[in-house]
A protein has these predicted regions:
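Short, acidic, metal-binding catalytic loop of nucleotide-sugar glycosyltransferases
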Residues: 25-36
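N-proximal low-complexity "stem/linker" segments adjacent to membrane-targeting elements
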Residues: 1-22
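Active-site-proximal specificity loops/subdomain of glycosyltransferases
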Residues: 39-85
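Membrane-proximal basic amphipathic "stem/tether" segments
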Residues: 2-4, 229-277
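Catalytic core and acceptor-binding pocket of nucleotide-sugar-dependent glycosyltransferases
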Residues: 151-219
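Short aromatic/hydrophobic "clamp" motif used to bind/position activated sugar donors
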Residues: 89
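Conserved donor-nucleotide/metal-binding helix-loop-beta segment in metal-dependent transferases, i.e.
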Residues: 101-131
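The conserved acidic donor/metal-binding loop of glycosyltransferases
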Residues: 95-97
Length: 277
């Protein structure tokens, strides 16, 4: 397929730099025919990997943010998108470690479709992100259930860059973005699609086969160990430790609610403004 023009955003932050070499080693093995330009959304750090053309965004450095005053997740995402010059971007994160060959032809078919079809703002490429509700005229694409709480997701997805920028609010975390961004998307009447859940199934057939996800809550997800061992990737797992699911105490739940209150208020007011426009 010719003249496929898109960018790939690997969203990250500098404290996840231990993921970068493993990520791109697996990338170089499992996506050899990738034609998109790769952007690694670093804060201050530069980065390169042999035989891959990677642009380190260095958003905080470019915007002169002091290291003792961290930018928000959403600010960094916005700055990265603003550096790109393509209409369509593929969104991924630094701990989406590839485990098998990427179906590049399918991705390029969807990019070509998005360039032609004005009513496709996003295509979720996994069955793990949003709820599919009904088939569409587009081959192997379902419409996203816009009544479900999760309308947008930070899993692997193709986006119209301007539509993704419309959803971003500088003060939000990734979790805030998914929750409140889903509400904004409904008001803005964006058109979202997801791959056919009868065709794309985790661990059976995946367009971008990757671990969901390699780091959870800042700690390694245990399936990473086997994947890294298989590919001779050395890692000091003691630095992060391993994620273990534990129920939150009442005190922890209350603390999280209190911390979220200012963002909840700002995002609620923002929704009201969108509704009256």
């Amino acid at each position: 397929m010719q003249n496929i023009n898109y960018s790939i955003l690997i969203n990250t932050c500098d404290k996840f730099d231990d993921c970068w070499d493993p990520f791109f080693k697996l990338w170089s093995l499992y996506w050899t025919d990738c034609s998109g330009r790769i952007y690694l959304n670093t804060e201050y750090k530069d980065y390169s990997y042999p035989e891959l053309d990677i642009t380190a965004v260095k958003g905080c450095d470019r915007h002169h943010i002091p290291k003792e005053k961290r930018a928000t997740w959403s600010q960094c995402l916005k700055w990265a998108l603003e550096t790109m010059d393509t209409d369509i971007i593929l969104y991924m994160q630094e701990d989406y470690f590839l485990k098998d060959t990427v179906k590049n032809e399918i991705i390029e078919e969807y990019i070509s479709l998005m360039e032609k079809a004005k009513d496709i703002d996003c295509i979720q490429l996994t069955d793990q992100a949003v709820k599919a509700v009904s088939s569409t005229p587009y081959k192997h694409l379902y419409s996203v259930d816009m009544h479900h709480w999760s309308v947008i997701s930070c899993q692997a997805s193709l986006w119209k860059r301007t539509k993704l920028l419309e959803l971003i609010r500088d003060y939000e975390s990734a979790w805030n973005f998914e929750w409140w961004g889903s509400k904004r998307a409904r008001i803005l009447q964006h058109k979202y699609y997801v791959v056919d859940p009868n065709q794309v199934i985790l661990d059976k057939f995946e367009i971008i086969p990757y671990i969901f996800t390699g780091v959870v809550g800042g700690k390694w997800y245990k399936p990473v160990v086997e994947l890294f061992k298989k590919h001779n990737i050395e890692m000091d797992y003691t630095h992060r430790g391993f994620f273990e699911r534990k129920p939150l105490s009442l005190k922890e739940k209350l603390y999280k609610k209190i911390v979220r209150l200012p963002i909840e208020l700002r995002s609620s007011l923002d929704l009201m403004r969108l509704k009256v426009k």
